[in-house]
Amino acid sequence: MNSVGEACTDMKREYDQCFNRWFAEKFLKGDGSGDPCTDLFKRYQQCVQKAIKEKEIPIEGLEFMGHGKEKPENSS
C-alpha cells in the first residue's frame, strides 16, 4: 500500500520491512528490547504529516500524533 504522500512511499516500505523483520526475528522470540526502526518511523511520520498539511487533509488531532500525548477525552 502506498503512503498518503508520494514522497513518503519509499520511507513507508523501508519502515514496514524493518518493523516486520524486527517483529518476526526479535519480538516474537521474546526479545522486546529496543526497536531498531524508531528513526525510520520518525522520518516517515514527519513526511506523512507534511503531506497531510500540504494536501490540506482535515485530520482532527494531528497536532498530537506521535508526541506521547493522549487524545483529549472530549474527542471521538
Swiss-Prot record:
Pfam families: UPF0203. The modification N-acetylmethionine is found at M1. GO terms for biological process: apoptotic process; cellular response to UV; DNA damage response, signal transduction by p53 class mediator; mitotic G1 DNA damage checkpoint signaling; negative regulation of apoptotic process; negative regulation of intrinsic apoptotic signaling pathway in response to DNA damage by p53 class mediator; negative regulation of release of cytochrome c from mitochondria; phospholipid transport. One of its GO terms (cellular component) is mitochondrial intermembrane space. It catalyses: a 1,2-diacyl-sn-glycero-3-phosphate(in) = a 1,2-diacyl-sn-glycero-3-phosphate(out). A motif (Cx9C motif 1) lies at residues 8-18. GO terms for molecular function: p53 binding; phosphatidic acid transfer activity. Residues 5-55 form the CHCH domain. PROSITE patterns: CHCH. The record marks F27, F41 as: Important for interaction with PRELID3A. It is found in: Mitochondrion; Mitochondrion intermembrane space. A motif (Cx9C motif 2) lies at residues 37-47. Its main location: mitochondrion. Disulfide bonds join C8-C47, C18-C37. Keywords: Acetylation, Apoptosis, Coiled coil, Disulfide bond, Lipid transport, Mitochondrion, Transport. Residues 1-52 form a coiled coil. Monomer. Interacts with APAF1 and HSP70. Forms a complex with PRELID1 in the mitochondrion intermembrane space. Interacts with PRELID3A. Belongs to the TRIAP1/MDM35 family. Involved in the modulation of the mitochondrial apoptotic pathway by ensuring the accumulation of cardiolipin (CL) in mitochondrial membranes. In vitro, the TRIAP1:PRELID1 complex mediates the transfer of phosphatidic acid (PA) between liposomes and probably functions as a PA transporter across the mitochondrion intermembrane space to provide PA for CL synthesis in the inner membrane. This is TP53-regulated inhibitor of apoptosis 1. It comes from Mus musculus (Mouse). The gene is Triap1.
